[in-house]
Amino acid sequence: MDEFDFNAAPPEFQEIRWMVASIFLISGTGWIVNYVTTIRTALRDRTSGVTLLSLCNNLAWETVFAVIHRPPHLIAALVITVWLLVNIYVIYVSVKFARESQDVSPLLRRHLPVVTLLGFVGFLTGHIALSMHLGPTKALYWGGMICQVTLSASALGLLIQRGHTRGASPAMWLSRFIASSFGVPGLFVRAVYWPSAWGWADNILMRWLSGVFFLLDLSYGAIYYHISRSEHEVGASGSKMSKRE
């Protein structure tokens, strides 16, 4: 992972090195806040607003780059390790409440921990294979973008399918959106100011994935607002009817 040896970067990158570090720190902190908020919201509503599919994918990616291909950059290694540790509890809470839900079939409820473990192992082998094929640094960012789009798409689909905001919250969406809104452009900044090491990141597929993320997460915010407002209107109407009775 020579790309993380910022001391070897050209002078133009050194001038904005503080910006790159700040962007990564903001993005990393935002995702930690998102995970913690996800846990709190799930405990409050006794349901998770994130799919186990996307959480297993995230955990597999975090395991590969916190344990197997640990970045030599201190902040990056520390942030990914914290993500891994917190995400383990996110998955625990999600599995716990999914097994209590009547929307899940009895067969799946009984075997959900095993299914979750198999999903994690499946994604883990995929991220390891991607690292062997592309190299650790490229796999870290390509895999990370795939995780991002998968999480955003599945969260949006879950919100639309349920038609209610239980298990979700504005803080969950906003922390995720802010974290990735800093992290994604940060990769392109590296490509512009250090093209010999990071030029591979500036391509049409990475731009497409970035655009899809923004489209999905902005749509999530708009739909969440619409559903939340409808819930408040129904609640207000119910209160008025109760008073009349």
Curated annotation (Swiss-Prot):
The chain crosses the membrane at residues 19-39, 48-68, 75-95, 112-132, 140-160, 177-197, 208-228. Pathway: Secondary metabolite biosynthesis; terpenoid biosynthesis. It is a multi-pass membrane protein. It comes from the Eukaryota. Shearone derivatives produced by this cluster are interesting candidates for Alzheimer's disease (AD) therapy since they moderately inhibit aggregation of amyloid beta 42 (Abeta42). Keywords: Lyase, Membrane, Transmembrane, Transmembrane helix. InterPro entries: PaxB-like (IPR039020). GO terms for cellular component: membrane. It is an enzyme of class 4 (lyase). The keyword Zinc-finger does not apply. Belongs to the paxB family. Terpene cyclase; part of the cluster that mediates the biosynthesis of shearones, diterpenoid pyrones (DPs) which are structurally diverse meroterpenoids consisting of a diterpene linked by a pyrone, and which may exhibit a range of bioactivities. Within the pathway, esdpB takes part to the biosynthesis of the molecular scaffold by catalyzing the cyclization of the prenyl group initiated by protonation and ring-opening of the epoxide to produce the diterpenoid pyrone scaffold. This is Terpene cyclase esdpB. The lineage of its organism: Eukaryota, Fungi, Dikarya, Ascomycota, Pezizomycotina. The gene is esdpB.
